[in-house]
């Protein structure tokens, strides 16, 4: 059976391990999240490569 002091010791032990690891990993977290997003997520809002065309109704004013 675990007592309250055992639970507090486990919480403090985890805090001593994971807070410094998170602080050290924060600069590379952006790179990791971008890499996983590019690997697993579908690209959105991407237009196919091609020439830029103007709509046929839009015409310049002749002066």
From Swiss-Prot:
Keywords of the record: Cell inner membrane, Cell membrane, Cellulose biosynthesis, Membrane, Transmembrane, Transmembrane helix
Name used for this protein in its record: Cellulose biosynthesis protein BcsF
GO cellular-component term (any): plasma membrane
Subcellular location: Cell inner membrane
Native source organism of the sequence: Salmonella typhimurium (strain LT2 / SGSC1412 / ATCC 700720)
InterPro entries per UniProt: Cellulose_BcsF/YhjT (IPR019995)
Mode of membrane association: Single-pass membrane protein
Statement: the UniProt record of this protein carries the keyword Transmembrane: yes
Family (UniProt): Belongs to the BcsF family.
Residues that span the membrane, as ranges: 4-24
Role this protein plays: Required for cellulose biosynthesis.
One Pfam family cited in the UniProt record for this chain: CBP_BcsF
Gene Ontology terms describing biological process: cellulose biosynthetic process
């Amino acid at each position: 059976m675990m007592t309250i002091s055992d639970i507090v010791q486990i919480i403090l032990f985890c805090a001593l391990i994971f807070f410094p690891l998170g602080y050290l990993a924060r600069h590379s977290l952006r790179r990791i999240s971008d890499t996983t997003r590019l690997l697993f997520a579908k690209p959105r809002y991407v237009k196919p490569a091609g020439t830029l065309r103007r709509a046929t109704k839009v015409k310049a004013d002749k002066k």
